[in-house]
């Protein structure tokens, strides 16, 4: 995989349609947007850019022989996860992956309330103008019509997910403002900003299937309701966009397997894939947060394409 950086932009002309996905850590890209990434990356008229904000240094390590990489030991997990991310990108067909500000510029902040929140380089403590300028630089270079990240809570309250949301919102506005970071390139107006969404019906389906499962790291174990999960659930009526691509199911699973320190092959994610399988991992949902909604399809009226309603130009 060729990894571009803001300091060394590609000079080759980009396809007409361009989408940028902003994620907090390696592995986040595949969980909520793996189908979207793979399907758009496979389209010859679409360029996909993945921006990863940190190296995920504070992540857990599920491989016993790699436990020495943990932040509280050798603190080498971030470097290892660069390789995992490269493997995931290869599985998804992504050729343009960037780290915000370059690899290691901002560090994984850990879960809220942990000592990692106080690390001077963590994304949670980043100067927002500085971090936003780095994302704006990439937006102005790539000129995406579509920008994708998380909701205001980051899906489940992780500080880096919240920051990724804030930075993406800033980039949507600031990339079009000639007074903001003029050194970061010519202005560009993104047409649509989306937030990833976990549809309530999808969570309920998983809950009903797995609540009594003995699968390792089953998040439903001991719960009586999906509302106890601690994640943001979006009512089905509020979902604006649904992407379904069962033929990219295997690519998504292969990308998940690449993140071996984070996802146990005996754990919940793969048990879910083997259980309700394509119903769980072949459909992804989004909420259009900014921009004009395109034409819908089917009885639910949802968009079936993040580019719905757009006339894309070079």
UniProtKB/Swiss-Prot annotation:
Q: Which reaction does it catalyse?
A: 1D-myo-inositol 2-acetamido-2-deoxy-alpha-D-glucopyranoside + H2O = 1D-myo-inositol 2-amino-2-deoxy-alpha-D-glucopyranoside + acetate
Task: Classify the source by domain of life.
Answer: Bacteria
Q: Which cofactors must be present for this protein to function?
A: Zn(2+)
Q: Does the keyword Transmembrane apply?
A: no
EC number per UniProt: 3.5.1.103
What molecular function terms (GO) are annotated for this protein?
A: N-acetylglucosaminylinositol deacetylase activity; zinc ion binding
Q: Mind telling me which SUPFAM superfamilies this protein's record contains? A: LmbE-like (SSF102588)
What function is annotated for this protein?
Catalyzes the deacetylation of 1D-myo-inositol 2-acetamido-2-deoxy-alpha-D-glucopyranoside (GlcNAc-Ins) in the mycothiol biosynthesis pathway.
Q: What is this protein called?
A: 1D-myo-inositol 2-acetamido-2-deoxy-alpha-D-glucopyranoside deacetylase 2
Gene name linked to the record: mshB2
